């Protein structure tokens, strides 16, 4: 068998392998190579329908398994060979078999962006509601890696636009992370709930949007009832997330719709402005200041926005804060007396 494995696996010499088999070479369907892989899997990988047919005709198991539980049909889905997938199914391969991660051939096809294969498997009756480990369905993979047309196809076939995994993370959250307004709009129109929170940390879809999305998506979520002041288990609000990611567009929309400028996260007591200064986020700081954020708010260690910017070495941010009225006192000391950054220290010491 090793000679056949070498021809198929290593040299891709399918014609010679077929010639050997037709000449009476003794096949051992249960034989596995050093990768614990049967010859049938290598035939699928090489996309040779003729060799697959020959091997199945010689007794190879269409539902053979790799060490991770994957089947030949999953391999066909991964390698996007519809003719082989069709042949395997005609020979009673299990359509919804799953590997040790709970993946089916359908999930595999979507995950590898083979959406023609995905449609083929759905038309053959693949279960679009099957769940992998942690509760992911094929719709999650289509939302993450596909187009609106792929997502629409699955929803039209019965996939739940409000689908969520075991931690209550929804497909809508993944669509928001992609920053795709049309996909977000479509899912909402088809029933996605903008108010769902994850069970693990009480995160909401607007919090995702505040980090990754544009103003159009943020506005769309707010229009459909998303809470601009949702607080997760870390005390983070959407505006705090916008501050940590320097997302000015999202922050502008959140503030216009009533986001709390002085909300504080739980661990360090940061407000959006404190967090932005701590992380040196230059774009969002002017917006927060212009909208009235407290320039002299203090975190749990008593540091102000200016103190945080000084500690992190953000000279331009320090200049901006001072020019807009940030206090120079830290308790009984002047911030210039405690700052370590030389450029900032010089700038502060030269102030009138």
Where are these regions (language model features)?
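Ankyrin-repeat inter-repeat connecting loop/turn
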Residues: 27-29, 62, 95, 128, ...
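Ankyrin repeat structural motif
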Residues: 13-21, 48-56, 81-89, 114-122, ...
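Core solenoid repeat modules with strong leucine/isoleucine-rich periodicity
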Residues: 133-136, 141-145, 165-169, 173-178, ...
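Ankyrin repeat A-helix N-terminal signature
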Residues: 7-12, 42-48, 75-81, 108-114, ...
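Ankyrin-repeat-protein effector appendages
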Residues: 1-7, 157, 224, 257, ...
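Intrinsically disordered, low-complexity regulatory segments in ankyrin-centric signaling systems
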Residues: 1-41, 45-46, 53, 57, ...
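Start-of-repeat signature of ankyrin repeats
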Residues: 36, 69, 102, 135, ...
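Ankyrin repeat boundary/linker residues
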Residues: 31-33, 66, 99, 132, ...
């Amino acid at each position: 068998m090793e000679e056949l494995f070498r021809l198929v696996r290593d040299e891709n010499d399918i014609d010679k392998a077929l010639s050997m088999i037709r000449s009476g070479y003794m096949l051992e369907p249960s034989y596995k190579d050093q990768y614990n892989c049967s010859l049938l899997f290598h035939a699928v990988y090489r996309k040779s329908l003729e060799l697959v047919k020959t091997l199945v005709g010689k007794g190879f198991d269409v539902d053979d398994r790799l060490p991770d539980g994957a089947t030949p049909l999953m391999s066909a889905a991964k390698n996007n060979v519809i003719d082989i997938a069709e042949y395997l199914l005609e020979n009673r391969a299990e359509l919804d078999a799953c590997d040790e991660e709970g993946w089916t051939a359908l999930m595999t096809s979507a995950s590898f962006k083979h959406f023609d294969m995905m449609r083929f498997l759905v038309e053959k009756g693949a279960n679009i509601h099957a769940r992998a480990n942690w509760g992911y369905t094929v719709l999650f993979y289509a939302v993450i890696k596909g187009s609106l047309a792929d997502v629409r196809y699955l929803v039209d076939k019965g996939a739940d636009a409000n689908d969520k995994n075991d931690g209550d993370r929804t497909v809508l959250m993944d669509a928001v992370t992609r920053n795709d307004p049309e996909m977000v709009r479509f899912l909402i129109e088809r029933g996605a709930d903008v108010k769902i929170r994850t069970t693990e940390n009480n995160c909401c879809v607007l919090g995702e949007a505040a980090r990754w999305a544009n103003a159009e998506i943020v506005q769309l979520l707010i229009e459909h009832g998303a809470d601009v002041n949702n607080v997760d288990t870390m005390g983070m609000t959407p505006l705090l997330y916008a501050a940590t990611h320097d997302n000015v567009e999202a922050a502008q929309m959140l503030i216009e719709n009533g986001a709390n400028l002085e909300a504080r996260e739980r661990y360090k007591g940061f407000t959006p402005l404190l967090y932005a200064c701590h992380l040196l986020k230059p774009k969002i700081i002017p917006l927060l200041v212009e909208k009235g954020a407290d320039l002299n708010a203090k975190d749990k260690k008593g540091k102000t926005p200016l103190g945080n910017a000084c500690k992190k070495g953000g000279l331009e941010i320090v200049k901006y804060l001072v020019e807009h009225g940030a206090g120079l006192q830290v308790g009984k000391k002047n911030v210039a007396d405690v700052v370590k950054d030389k450029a900032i220290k010089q700038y502060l010491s030269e102030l009138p």
